């Protein structure tokens, strides 16, 4: 069995951790060997938080090298573009179309790059770009954007039954937030 990899990118504090916990739980429930690692790039000052998730029959390291990731899940377009060098040719990017302006844009020193989705596609990526923030808000809370993205990611794992994702939400999310997260997952999956 080949090792599959996912690189998850985030600008929303805490979201990557929950999303990677859900993904890790799902993969473990399917008897994969799973390795997870987080890299914090001064997120409190506008840097990325990246979680690497690798899985397969046997995985020795969570680190994903450039050109090796099968998928990137990004909470913001510029973050997806920043990490595209880690995606293998023909890899999948699932990206929230939200634009979070980095400090150089906020201060007027730079402009937010345009046409990011088409540039990622031109670089050889398969891009699934949707307004997952609006999807999360439709579910009941913008904070559920991570689960909406996980719902969409689940479509790219046809070998993993949908109930495994639902069970992961039940196992990890506090009971009072489960209904909201299940709704966000379903809306994201079917977006």
Each predicted region: which residue ranges?
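Active-site cofactor/cluster-binding pocket
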Residues: 1-191
